[in-house]
Amino acid sequence: MNRLSKELGVTCTVDVGLMSIVFNCFDGNDCVSQSLSIANTGVNTSKLYRMEQFVDHFPEEEAHMTGEDIHKRLDEIEEIHALYSPAKLGLAAALACCGFTFLLGGGPVEMVLAFIAAGIGNLIRTKLIKHHYTLFLNIAVSVSAACFTYAVFLKLAELVFHIPELHEAGYICSMLFIIPGFPFITSGIDLAKLDLRSGLERLTYAIIIVMVATLFAWIMALLLHLEPADFTALHLSAAARLIFRVIASFCGVFGFSIMFNSSHSMAATAAFIGAIANTLRLELVDFTHMPPAAAAFIGALTAGLLASFIKKSNGYPRISLTVPSIVIMVPGLYLYRAIYNFGIMSLTDAVSWFTSAIMIIVMLPLGLIFARILTDRTFRYCT
């Protein structure tokens, strides 16, 4: 808006929230005000990319068009809806959670079961969103479905393949598709620019999703007799673990990026960034014994710097690359274990998990913010 108002020779003020926006425009003589509110919110990186292209090309193209032609161009962008069917989005969530499972310490059994359960859970969630069901309902139903599916397929695997019950911990990973990474991280970026209304509303939205999801997952765990135990140790060499982490990080970020409605090329670019940044984070924790929160800051900073460098060549919006690439670093496992332990009144463990989660969650947007400060002059100063 700053760039377009400068091109048009007008002054603009805007009040942005999660569900509404109020816009005022002055040209020295007249004032025009517009307001808009929506019933639901979501992420559409493809539309964001087209909007950024519109702004970038405005001085050469749109500035010479009539008002009617500009409205037609904006209408074309507005018509960009979901690029993928619910089945494909379910598959994307399955891939993301499968990669997430390995990165959290799970083995092949947990990965396969999480793949199936997360795919079904997100398929149901996508169907509910498509039919405009309320946020609480789609979170509760999709998380419950994922946990139930994991438990059913684990029991079938025990009966058919004689797999031991040691693999039940993976049920946590099957619901990680619900993690509100985009609002969590963008709320921090908004707060860094003192956009308090937008930042606090996004943060509140993210907290609501986490609370509802973890509470229903806890209830399902009690009903299905599941416990968030530690994963069985994987006996891998350092080199093999490094290679698998790169692959799992790439797959996880690619899946999350597809869920954000990115094109295949945009998702692959974000996955490339995430594979480097997340593997670096995990290796720092393992080999330098760096605290996870500090490693998360370095990982997010790396992702932000890489995205800024790549943006110069392909023009993808920075936020469409950075957020998917670090969503996989959001400690959903820690948050769930915190709520689970609160539920069974194991308060010492709950506070420990919750504190660790908060430290990492704060560090992730902080890393992106400082990467943006280093590489974006307009972000470096108050505007």
Task: Kindly label every feature range from the protein language model.
Residues 103-117, 166-180, 232-248, 288-301, ...:
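Structural signature of hydrophobic alpha-helical transmembrane segments
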Residues 170-175, 188, 194-209, 272, ...:
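C-terminal transmembrane helix-loop-helix hairpin of multi-pass membrane proteins
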